[in-house]
Structures are given as structure tokens and as C-alpha cells.
Amino acid sequence: MKSAVLAALSALNSCPMQPNITVRLQRELFDAAAEAAQLTRGRSDVGALVQFTGICRGAEEGEPIAALTLEHYPGMAEAEIERHVGEALARWPLMGVTVIHRYGRLSPGEPIVLVIAASSHRAAAFAAAEFLMDYLKTRAPFWKQVETANAANWVDAKATDDAAAERWRERDDAAE
């Protein structure tokens, strides 16, 4: 379901057809190929599709991971992700965006997040997908707990993730 803000931003996007937008939080596994097919179905204007799938690693700092638990603030998380999808639509000429983020207890090797950006050209698709992942890693209202054989610890955002997200703000400042 598309929020009113996202619908308004979609209308301002420079693409002639309305962008296909999917934002979903779920416990279940997702099918990345099926999601990509759904995003581009009926669109002959898509020339580039960039897809990122984040996967639960089997080790953190050399220690084996038993599980990863992701929690979120229902309603707020979807609204915040939609807001950033809207920002991506305002920045780049996108034909569509899919963001699916899982929550609950995940095992190593399972997919966590899917971001797909569709555009007529690769530069916009790559930039939008990277922008959205940088946001999801640093600002989305998710909490991550890593469970090892010895402990379960809540994880903070990494400085490298914060630096990656900061470059988008620096680009905005330079453009003004």
C-alpha cells in the first residue's frame, strides 16, 4: 500500500508512466527473481534494473553466528522507508522501487533485505539502490541482535555505514 506522501512524490517523478513501488516488511522469505519480474511487468521503458540482496552472515568478527534477530517499530518503519523511497524518486528518474525487509529470527545464509531500483539507465538505478541501502543500514527503525554460542548482543550502526550515508548529505550540501 502506497502512502499519500509516496503517491505525491511518485507523481513528481520525471518518468512518463507512474513508478511501481513496493515497500514491505515480513517474516517470510522473499523470492528476489519474482519481485524483479513484478517490478518490471508491463514496462518497456526499463533499461536498467539494479538488485541488492543482503544475506545473514555466518560469522561476526570471526565468531560463528547462531542467529540474527531483527525487530522493528510497526507502522513507523514502513512510513520511514516509504519516505526515503520518495526521496529516491525525487532524486533520480526511476520507473520503480522495491524494498522488502525481513524481521524476526533469521539463520545464517537467509536473505534479510531486498532493494531493487528500475530506471531507463544504469547510473540512476545504481545510485538509487545504493542510496536506499545506505539509509536502511543507518536510519531505518530496525534493531539487530546477533546471537552467538556465547552471547546475544544488540548491534549499533557501524561508523563505515554512517560515513556511507553521510556522503548523500554532502552531495546535497554541495548542490545548494
Placement of each model-derived feature along the sequence:
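Intrinsic disorder/low-complexity segments
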Residues: 1-16
